[in-house]
Regions:
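Short, non-transmembrane cytosolic segments of multipass membrane proteins
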Residues: 1-42
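Juxtamembrane cytosolic face of transmembrane helices
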Residues: 118-119, 149-173
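Phosphoinositide-dependent membrane-docking surfaces
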Residues: 131-132, 139-159
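A membrane-cytosol interface segment of integral membrane proteins
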Residues: 161-224
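Cytosolic/matrix-facing juxtamembrane and C-terminal tails of multi-pass cellular membrane proteins
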Residues: 138-142, 148, 205, 209, ...
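Alpha-helical transmembrane spans
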Residues: 53-120, 233-306
Length: 306
């Protein structure tokens, strides 16, 4: 569970590109010798645009679950035992509130990062006009030219003693060196080679067209116009340990608790809507041969390529 860029280790902006970022740059017109992988991140795909979920979507609800449980801890751990032991006492109540209120404020702030916000923060890649649209946390939209974005691998938090990585897109100033804004593509892992599969999926769509990756999309998130179903969210959370059945089984109680937080976060958040001018730029033909969305999903999420 890595919340880099959202909670901890915010993406630094208004700075120059580092040597490491330059050496890890992902070249847009270079075809990598690796198979593209959609990472179960697609919402829609067609001849005009590819829309994906945000980097943190796979973890959505985990922090909410921790906070919801955490909000009740002082009551059950301190207040109720105190009342049972000494009865109602104003001084004890003041001490309890003095300690608990700052803690509740912290839990509420963390909870607001996942709940009472947006169900997701979509990223849309338009291969026709070569533009990228990123839905920000405040409801505004970042619009940038695909050719002007500097994509690179970025260091995240360490996971179980190993360095975790993600793919970042830096929007640069006119000098070509100063970072004005950063967004991340869906997916993070300690295995850099896996990220290159995910990058190749996005890169081929934008550089080679929808036909190059159409058959690589097996399942789409049904969240464009409605909130995610509880069962879909629960199954999707298991994908964070895809290919590790023992880990999935052993952590199934954790996933279940987190799924309740995910359900709460989704039900208290709004569905993002693109501005009318962006929808006009991304118009899709009714008989698009490369149309993929949730209406064509199989019954279950394929966790491995078919």
């Amino acid at each position: 569970m890595d919340y880099t860029g959202l909670l901890a280790k915010k993406y630094r902006v208004n700075r120059k590109l580092t040597d490491e970022e330059r050496s890890n740059q992902l070249i847009k017109n270079k075809r990598y010798k690796t198979e593209p992988f959609y990472n179960i991140s697609v919402i829609k795909e067609n001849s005009t645009y590819l829309e994906c979920v945000d980097r943190w979507f796979i973890y959505r609800g985990s922090m909410a679950a921790v906070c919801l449980v955490g909000l009740t801890v002082p009551v059950y751990s301190f207040f109720i035992p105190l009342i049972l032991a000494v009865g109602f006492d104003r001084i004890a109540l003041c001490i309890f509130l003095g300690i608990s209120i700052p803690y509740w404020i912290l839990m509420g702030w963390l909870l607001s990062k996942e709940a009472f916000s947006w169900t997701h923060f979509p990223i849309r890649f338009n291969c026709k006009n070569r533009m990228v649209y990123v839905f920000r946390r405040n409801g505004t939209v970042l619009i940038a030219k695909w050719d002007d974005i500097f994509f690179t691998l970025g260091r995240c938090e360490r996971m179980v003693g190993r360095q975790n990585w993600d793919i970042r897109g830096h929007v640069l100033d006119k000098d070509g060196e100063t970072i004005l804004e950063t967004f991340a593509l869906p997916g993070d892992t300690v295995l850099v080679e896996q990220l290159k599969h995910c990058w190749e999926f996005i890169r081929r769509y934008m550089e080679e067209g929808p036909a190059s990756v159409y058959r690589d999309v097996y399942w789409c998130h049904d969240i464009a116009e409605r909130r995610e179903k509880y069962t879909a969210g629960l199954r999707y959370m298991f994908f964070s340990l895809n290919g590790q059945p023992i880990g999935q089984i052993s952590l199934s109680p954790v996933f279940f608790v987190a799924s309740l937080g995910r359900w709460f976060a989704m039900r208290t958040s709004k569905i993002p809507k693109w501005p009318a001018e962006i929808e006009a730029e991304c118009a899709v033909d009714a008989f698009d041969p490369y149309l993929r969305d949730a209406s064509r999903n199989p019954e279950k999420i394929p966790t491995e390529p078919m």
